[in-house]
């Protein structure tokens, strides 16, 4: 049996618009990146994408992605329910902790459901170190796979000039 590759699974791509996006394949690396950006004072202009198997899916397949059942996708109500619980109770909570913003609630949320996918959107304005910024988290699961896409974007809010 060979050793697993322990290198961080991260890459950087540039979009057509010229934006730089960090792409992660691992939840821990993603969360560590957010924590480091917060500590480096670059928390208000982050654009990253995470594509991963949720921990509950890996647990059921004994940590082997090859053993994940084909029925584990957006058409499976149990998968969707567990994914939503994972997002609400773990992913968003971990983002709050990494940003050092325990008061972050993500009250502006929505759900879009189509035959091909389910998308949850979470938005919140936050203030950290006297800087306002918007946080956008989009979680998407598809009809053909247990892989989950997470887009994490923070955008600085321009300061309003005093009249």
Curated annotation (Swiss-Prot):
It comes from the Eukaryota. It is found in: Cell membrane. Pfam families: RGI1. Keywords: Cell membrane, Membrane. One of its GO terms (cellular component) is plasma membrane. The keyword Membrane applies. It is a peripheral membrane protein. Belongs to the RGI1 family. Involved in the control of energetic metabolism and significantly contribute to cell fitness, especially under respiratory growth conditions. This is Respiratory growth induced protein 1. It comes from Lachancea thermotolerans (strain ATCC 56472 / CBS 6340 / NRRL Y-8284) (Yeast).
């Amino acid at each position: 049996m060979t050793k697993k590759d322990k290198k961080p699974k991260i890459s950087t791509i540039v979009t057509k618009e010229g934006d730089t996006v960090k792409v992660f394949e691992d939840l821990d690396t993603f969360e560590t990146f957010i924590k480091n950006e917060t500590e480096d004072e670059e928390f208000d202009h982050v654009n990253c994408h995470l594509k991963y198997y949720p921990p509950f899916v890996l647990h059921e397949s004994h940590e082997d992605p090859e053993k994940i059942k084909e029925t584990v996708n957006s058409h499976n109500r149990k998968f969707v329910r567990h994914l939503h619980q994972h997002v609400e109770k773990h992913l968003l909570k971990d983002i709050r902790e990494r940003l050092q913003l325990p008061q972050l609630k993500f009250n502006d949320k929505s759900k879009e459901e189509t035959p091909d996918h389910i998308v949850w959107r979470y938005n919140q304005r936050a203030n950290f170190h006297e800087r306002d910024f918007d946080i956008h988290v989009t979680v998407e699961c598809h009809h053909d796979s247990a892989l989950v896409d997470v887009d994490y974007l923070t955008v600085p809010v321009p300061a309003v000039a005093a009249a």
